[in-house]
């Protein structure tokens, strides 16, 4: 069975989350340096069956795109060119970073660990994936 992959795209780092094969549980996978993201996806797609990729869509409260959308659009063009057969969807990612930090607090992580932006990105990708699964 194939998995679903979610990306919390950032200009420096991208958080990656994946479902189990039954598509019931979302788990953080890793955080990738964004310039290495396409190579990471190539390798991952060779080793794992992936049914679709979800990419976070950052929006402002008035539903207009955030400033980072310009960079995401550049990535999406490259993604579609490199992986034309892979279905891709956008998922509203408003507040995922705040939710990620709150989940770290609720989980009892020390302040030093909560400052780990790579971990925040990975948890944010997991929240994006969970949001999609529960819709």
From Swiss-Prot:
Transmembrane segments: none annotated. CDD domains: YqgF. GO terms for cellular component: cytosol. InterPro entries: RNaseH-like_sf (IPR012337), YqgF (IPR005227), YqgF/RNaseH-like_dom (IPR006641), YqgF/RNaseH-like_dom_sf (IPR037027). Its EC number is 3.1.-.-. Pfam families: RuvX. GO terms for biological process: rRNA 5'-end processing. SMART domains: YqgFc (SM00732). Keywords: Cytoplasm, Hydrolase, Nuclease, Ribosome biogenesis. It is found in: Cytoplasm. Disulfide bonds: none annotated. One of its GO terms (molecular function) is nuclease activity. The keyword Transcription does not apply. Its main location: cytoplasm. PANTHER family: POLYNUCLEOTIDYL TRANSFERASE, RIBONUCLEASE H-LIKE SUPERFAMILY PROTEIN. HAMAP family: Nuclease_YqgF (MF_00651). Could be a nuclease involved in processing of the 5'-end of pre-16S rRNA. Belongs to the YqgF nuclease family. This is Putative pre-16S rRNA nuclease. The lineage of its organism: Bacteria, Pseudomonadati, Bacteroidota, Flavobacteriia, Flavobacteriales.
């Amino acid at each position: 069975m194939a998995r679903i992959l979610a990306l919390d795209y950032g200009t420096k780092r991208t958080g990656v989350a994946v479902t189990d094969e039954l598509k019931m549980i979302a788990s953080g996978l890793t955080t990738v340096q964004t310039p290495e993201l396409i190579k990471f996806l190539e390798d991952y797609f060779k080793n794992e069956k992936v049914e679709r990729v979800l990419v976070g869509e950052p929006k402002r409260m008035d539903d207009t795109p955030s400033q980072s959308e310009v960079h995401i659009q550049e990535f999406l063009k490259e993604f579609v060119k490199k992986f034309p057969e892979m279905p891709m969807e956008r998922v509203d990612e408003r507040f995922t970073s705040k939710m990620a930090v709150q989940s770290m607090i609720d989980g009892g992580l020390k302040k030093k660990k909560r400052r780990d932006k790579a971990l925040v990105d990975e948890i944010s990708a997991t929240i994006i994936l969970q949001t999609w699964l529960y819709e």
